[in-house]
Amino acid sequence: MQDAIQAGLGVLSSVQYVELGAIKIFSDGALGGWTAWLTNVYSDDKGNCGFNIHSTAELERIVQDARKYRLPVAVHAIGDQAILEVASTLKKYPLPNKWRERI
């Protein structure tokens, strides 16, 4: 994100072959690899509920950094716990313009 900002890119600005639409964040993994972050354990992998890639504090910092530049975020969140965490963070730090977030 910092490189894009330093290059003067903002929402829908572009350079050759690249257009910035949102800051992409990965919050968890995938269901097939048992890494999507769930509120309950996987039925076929007891003791495993997946994991979050960023702590709550790290996720909030990334979103706050995007907000400094009025950038929306697009978040990969597959598991229900990941979706809850991301939705809570986005509600806490709303986007101050017309652009839309994506989960």
For each predicted feature, which ranges?
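Metal-coordinating catalytic core of metallo-dependent amide/deamination hydrolases
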Residues: 1-80, 84, 88
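Short helix-capping segments at alpha-helix termini
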Residues: 12-13, 92-99
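Residue-level recognition of the N-termini of beta-strands and the immediately preceding loop/turn
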Residues: 18, 98-102
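Extended hydrophobic secondary-structure segments that form protein cores and membrane-embedded regions
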Residues: 23, 102-103
